[in-house]
């Protein structure tokens, strides 16, 4: 998704078009700050949570289509703080995770309030650990068992092309070490400062990336693999 800078209306239109192209699915994943681009200085760009057009659209989409949809938004919460909030929206529920590892190299920590702990969202029997961009570099935070028990990790990102190799490598590492599926969704295009190459991927628990950006995640296959090769029993 090539995000239009600071334009939720245009990005909602674009998200709708991409979803139509993807076809029917149980879960759709959008990038980090998909409605605005990566707004380091959120004043005048971030939406108020109570009146967010992007969040309202996510709620409506989930309800109308009977699907789940997730992605992060630059949000001002009712306490007046800005948060990089990863929403997981289903027809009947909204779960959110506030990005814990704020990107100090880009001054994100100067404007946003971090979350305290991992969050797991459940949908159609599958447990998804919600993560955002820079979190990918910190394996202890997402460690299976320590972060909770889950079946898949979702990383939404604005990960620059200059560090693309790290993105590709770490997605596979998180899948292998936690014996789980990993869904990594990164934006494409340009913002005022950075180029983004994309590289979105769906990675199997053995580290193999799908040839398509649409995939079926099998709880049965995951359970059999974990039972046969019990790496998680020996985790730190």
Where in this protein do the model-derived segments appear?
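Cys-nucleophile CN-hydrolase/nitrilase-fold catalytic domain and related Cys-dependent amidase chemistry
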Residues: 8, 16-90, 96, 161, ...
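Hydrophobic residues at beta-strand termini and immediately following loops
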Residues: 1, 97, 121, 185, ...
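Short polar catalytic/cofactor-binding loops
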Residues: 1-7
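Short, acidic/polar
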Residues: 10-19, 137-143
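CN hydrolase (nitrilase-like) catalytic-core segments centered on the catalytic cysteine
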Residues: 53-70, 137-213
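Binuclear metal-dependent phosphoesterase catalytic core
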Residues: 204, 208-233
């Amino acid at each position: 998704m090539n995000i239009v800078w600071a334009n939720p209306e245009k990005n909602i239109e674009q998200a709708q078009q991409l979803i139509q192209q993807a076809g029917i699915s149980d879960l759709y994943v959008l990038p980090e700050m998909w409605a605005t681009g990566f707004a380091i200085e959120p004043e005048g760009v971030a939406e108020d949570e109570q009146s967010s057009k992007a969040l309202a659209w996510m709620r409506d989409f989930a309800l109308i289509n009977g699907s789940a949809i997730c992605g992060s938004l630059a949000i001002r919460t009712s306490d007046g703080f800005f948060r990089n909030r990863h929403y997981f929206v289903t027809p009947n529920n909204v779960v959110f995770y506030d990005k814990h590892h704020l990107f100090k190299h880009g001054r994100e920590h100067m404007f946003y309030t971090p979350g305290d702990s991992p969050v797991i969202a459940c949908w159609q029997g599958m447990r998804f650990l919600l993560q955002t961009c820079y979190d990918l570099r910190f394996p202890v935070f997402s460690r299976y068992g320590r972060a909770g028990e889950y079946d898949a990790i979702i990383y939404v990102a604005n990960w620059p092309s200059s560090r693309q190799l790290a993105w590709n490598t770490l997605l596979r590492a998180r899948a292998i070490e936690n014996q789980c599926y990993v869904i990594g969704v990164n934006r494409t295009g340009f913002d005022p400062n950075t180029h983004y190459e994309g590289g979105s991927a769906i990675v199997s628990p053995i580290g193999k990336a799908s040839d398509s950006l649409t995939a079926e995640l099998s709880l049965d296959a995951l359970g059999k693999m974990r039972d046969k090769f019990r790496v998680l029993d020996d985790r730190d």
